[in-house]
Structure formats: C-alpha cells, structure tokens
Design a protein with these regions (language model features):
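Glycine-rich phosphate-binding loops of nucleotide-dependent enzymes
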Residues: 1-193
C-alpha cells in the first residue's frame, strides 16, 4: 500500500474492500506492527509510532485478524485466558494489587465475569470458560478473538474478514455484535474485506 491517507471520525464504521493481494491489510498490519511499514499515524491528535503493537494497544487500538490461529488465539489456553490476557498484560485489568501494589495477582473472578459476559453475548458454544481455544469450532474461535478485542475496550478497532469461515447464523451475530459495540462505546470500527 502506498500513498494512503485516511481520516476516520470517532464512532464511524468504515469498510475497506478489495481483491485478495491488493494490500488492504497493510494498513492495520502496519499500525499494529505485524508488517514493516512507513508513514505516520495521528490518533486522537497524537502521533503514534508504526510497527509497535504494544504502543498501538496502549493507545486504544486493537486488531482482530483473519489469521485467528496465527495471531489471534492462544490455542493451548482457556477461553477466559484468551479473552482477558491482553487487557491484563497491557492495561493491568483483571489484576488485584496487594501490599500497596507490591504484589499483584490475577483476579480470577473478574476474568470469569468478563469471559461469561462475552460467551453469552456472542453465543460462544463451549463447555465453560475453561475450555481450551483449540477445541472450539472456527466460528467460535473467531468470536473469542472478537471478545478479546472488546475486552481491551478499544477506541479504534480494525477487523479483517470478520465472518470468514463461520456459518451464516454466526455471521449475522458477529456483524450485529460489532454494530452494537460501536453504538454502545462510540468505537471507530474499520472492517477490511
């Protein structure tokens, strides 16, 4: 992708479409540090470094990749761990401080509540929140990736091929969930397809 300039307004849902191999994923992949890129991103009036996943996420930008097994899921971890891990590591959510913050422990109750909320809202078909992500269907894995992004409470959310490889009922549910999240949180969503 070369010479692309986008101005996206808060709360907007924007679609980027094109043929396979045309580079449409270069935008979120560059911002999130998944592919080397050059240029500049100004987000909420602040210049952010490209090629830096941590800085993007700290500044409220998340990305749900179509490559859920490559960059989206921790396949050998539970659903609750998948949903809350990034928020725990980057935002220090789902953590209980002790001794004035000298010691920190996972807040298993808060993790369970968050996971159960998204399992219910996104109709993730599973035994419970402790089921391993690898044992879910592709559609349910995609829903876990979406829940993981929602748990980060992003202000800008990139979503690549959100309905690829999932059944028709789940497609509607995923698109409705994105719309609902946008409306309830005034989150800017960019859908790449």
């Amino acid at each position: 992708v070369k010479d692309v300039s986008l101005k996206i307004h808060q709360g907007e849902i924007l679609g980027i479409g094109g043929l396979a191999g045309q580079g449409k994923l270069g935008i979120p992949n560059g911002i999130m540090g998944l592919f080397p890129s050059g240029g500049e991103i100004i987000f909420e009036g602040k210049s952010l470094p490209l090629n830096n996943t941590l800085e993007a996420q700290k500044n409220g930008i998340s990305f749900v990749s179509e490559d859920r097994r490559g960059v989206g899921l921790l396949l050998d971890e539970s659903i609750d761990w998948n949903i809350t891990f990034n928020a725990m590591q980057i935002q220090e959510r789902f953590i209980k401080p002790y001794l004035g913050g000298l010691i920190k422990f996972r807040d298993d109750k808060a993790m369970k509540e968050c996971a159960d909320k998204y399992i219910d809202e996104l109709e993730i078909r599973c035994i419970n929140e402790k089921q391993l992500a690898r044992n879910l269907s592709g559609g349910n894995q995609q829903k876990v990736c979406l829940a993981k992004a929602f748990a980060m409470k992003p202000r800008l959310l990139f979503v690549s091929e959100p309905t690829r490889g999932i059944d028709i009922g789940a497609k509607k549910l995923v698109l409705d969930a994105l719309k609902k999240y946008n409306e309830e949180n005034n989150t800017t969503i960019v859908i790449i397809s």
